[in-house]
Amino acid sequence: LISEPMARLGAKVTGIDASEKNINIAKMHSMESGLKINYVNTSPEKLEDFETYDVILNLEIVEHVDNVDLYIKSCQKLLKKNGLMFTATLNRSLTSYIKAIIGAEYILRWLPIGTHDWNKFLKPEELESYLTKEKLITQDISGLKFNPFNKRWKKSSDLSVNYIICSLKN
């Protein structure tokens, strides 16, 4: 979802996804849009012999990963020295359960029921612990709030539902 906007802004983009179906749809859409994006059907764990990157965007992925420790370790290996990794996910809180699962999946039907497993959500300090273990230094933690009326996201100090951590590889 983020690859095309980043390419439109002039970034050299490699987009990866473990789902072949998602990659094929993304390739077709980027060709129709005239965007040059390198899409790869894989996961970070399998990309270790690949090139390294200045920036890695892990947006709304970590809460779907079975082995967060291995995932973060693999992403860290793909990051250049002094590179930045942005990791956005859902906090494991009562508020996130109500808004992200009951609200978004069951009431509003924005997502298929069962998309999220609340037990896989990470509290900010848990995610920070995984990042620190891999020598990634937290630069910023911000909440993200969605306004359903204007369909826009904005930065917030509220970490109770969605949040993003920017970390630096030193």
Go through each PLM region and give its residues.
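Class I SAM-dependent methyltransferase SAM/SAH-binding core
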Residues: 1-46, 70
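A conserved beta-strand element that flanks and buttresses the S-adenosyl-L-methionine
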Residues: 57
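Hydrophobic adenine-recognition pocket in adenosine-nucleotide-binding enzymes
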Residues: 61
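A short glycine-rich, Lys/Arg-flanked "PGG" loop and its adjoining helix->strand segment in the class I
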Residues: 69-84
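Conserved class I S-adenosyl-L-methionine
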Residues: 84-109
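Acceptor-substrate binding/catalytic loop of class I
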Residues: 89, 108-126
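Short alpha-helix
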Residues: 118-141
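Core SAM-dependent methyltransferase catalytic element
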Residues: 151-170
